[in-house]
Design a protein with these regions (language model features):
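Hydrophobic alpha-helix position signal
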Residues: 39, 78-79, 100, 150, ...
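Generic structural signal for short, solvent-exposed loop/turn connectors between secondary structure elements
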Residues: 49-58, 83, 95, 139-142, ...
Length: 199
């Protein structure tokens, strides 16, 4: 990348999975320190949650800080192991908080407390398992059409990620009907359920 700039963009919630970051944790001492620092700030063992099979990882109050920690640890590993020096950081949704830490705008401990509270509030708003999200992808997707198709369902457009992707969110029981309607009206669309306990 001669004369170019290096940008790192962090994803949002829904990117979590059991075992995330374990390889970096085991191979990079700096990553272990980040997980330890996060555990001290949050009062629970972040590494154990990320590397084990605990379903709490899919609860937004735990998923959000765990994702931020893993993203910062991965950044540390990339910098340490490959000597990459990012010029710019960005993020999508929850990833914006990680970008603030990476850019040195806010300390990790502060962001972890913020996203834990953010996730807890989301979790309190809707009982576990009653909310769902799906990404809908289609060239030049029309948000108004989506809203009209789903108007009588407890589902709405939650995010407009790009001209070609939106996220719908609402009651999980209504999600299959929403997907059926979208498939019938917009045959060329793709949709993917997102791994988020709350929407």
């Amino acid at each position: 990348m001669a004369n170019g700039k290096t940008a790192i963009v962090f994803p949002g919630q829904g990117s979590q999975r059991h075992g995330m970051g374990k390889d970096f944790y085991e191979s990079t001492p700096g990553c272990r320190r980040i997980y330890e620092q996060a555990s001290d700030a949050l009062g629970w063992d972040v590494a154990a949650l990320c590397f084990g099979e605990d379903e709490k990882l899919n609860l937004t109050a735990y998923a959000q800080p765990s994702i931020v920690v893993t993203e910062i640890a991965m950044l540390k590993a990339i910098i340490d192991q490959y000597g990459i020096t990012p010029d710019v950081f960005g993020g999508h949704s929850l990833g914006e908080y990680t970008a603030l830490v990476a850019a040195g705008v806010l300390p990790l401990e502060t962001v972890l407390r913020i996203v834990h509270i953010r996730g807890s509030l989301m979790q309190e708003a809707v009982p576990v398992g009653e909310g769902g999200m799906a990404a809908v992808i289609r060239k030049d997707i029309d948000t108004r059409t989506i809203r009209e198709l789903l108007a009588d369902l407890p589902i709405d457009v939650a995010n407009i990620n790009s001209p070609n992707q939106i996220v719908i969110s609402g009651r999980s029981k209504a999600m299959p009907e929403a997907e059926r309607r979208l498939a019938k009206a917009l045959a060329d669309r793709k949709s993917t359920r997102l791994n988020s306990s709350h929407s």
